[in-house]
Every structure is written in C-alpha cells, then in structure tokens.
C-alpha cells in the first residue's frame, strides 16, 4: 500500500495539508494532528475528518503526549469518528539535535494506558530519530508496537557506524529483534 503523509516539513500550513488530503484518493494517509489543527477550529474540521476516514485508512502522527491528549479529546468530542484508531509515535523529532531515546516512549504508553478502552488505538507504530532509532524501535517492538525504520529518521547503525543504505538499517534491526 502507498501511504501519503501530510507533514508540514516546515513549509506547508494546515490549509495546504487539508486541501491535499481532501483532493487525493489513496488507501492510507498519515496526518500530524498538531500540524493539521494549527490555526484551525477543531469543530470546523469534523466534516474533513469524516470524509478522510471514509476514503482512507488514517494514521495520526503524535510527537508527544500532548498530541495524544489532543487526539483523544477530538475522538471523545466526535470530531474524529473512527472505530479503528491508528497512531504513529514519533520519538526525537523535537528533541535536541533530533536525538531519540527509548524512554521517550514512556509518556505515550502512560497516556495510552489511562485511556478508556474505546479510545485506545487499534494499531500503534513508532519511528525514532537520530542515533537512538534502533534502540527505540527495539523497545517499542518489545511492547508490541509496529516499527518503521529508515534513512528519513536516522542513518546510524547500533554500533555508531553510518549505514550504507536502508537495507543495512533494516537488517540491523531484524538481527536484534527476538526470534
């Protein structure tokens, strides 16, 4: 499946992201909840989220527990109406030097664990930035969370060497996962 992401990348405002997501038809999209709501009235976005969820699988990108709180609130208020909530936890994106550490997963898990059953995600995924990418992914995998690895987030192997290609990162991760 092709997954389209609507992250702002420091370039696109929420109106541009909403316009893109409204016009395309793809099986799977990811939406950074904090970015899509920037300068938007959340209640006014209910029809947008309804249309998006009707035509695509939607993965909500969460950079911290505050994003998780916001998403949970939108679901609770029926602004986002879904029976199958999917989230992507992003570790290290807004940390010093975009470096992630496995303990950055803790606030996400703590918030998730206090949610009522109907607000818990059906599918969780993680990506992590910097040299800590693989240690973070290993921690997440041990919690039953799907992992996303690649050069977009980090180029370092667990031994500190720079990977020659994405396949080297994937192999390093797979080799370290329990059988």
What are these regions (language model features)?
Residues 10-14, 90-97, 156-157:
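Flexible glycine/acidic-rich beta-alpha junction loops that bind and position SAM and/or redox cofactors
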Residues 157-179:
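C-terminal helical cap(s) of enzyme catalytic domains, especially alpha/beta-barrels
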Residues 1-41:
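Active-site beta->alpha loop and helix N-cap motifs at the rims of alpha/beta catalytic domains
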Residues 28-151, 162-168:
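Catalytic alpha/beta core domains of metabolic enzymes, predominantly
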Residues 21-22, 49-53, 173, 177:
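Alpha-helix C-terminal capping segments
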Residues 1-4, 151, 178-179:
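Alpha/beta catalytic barrel-like cores
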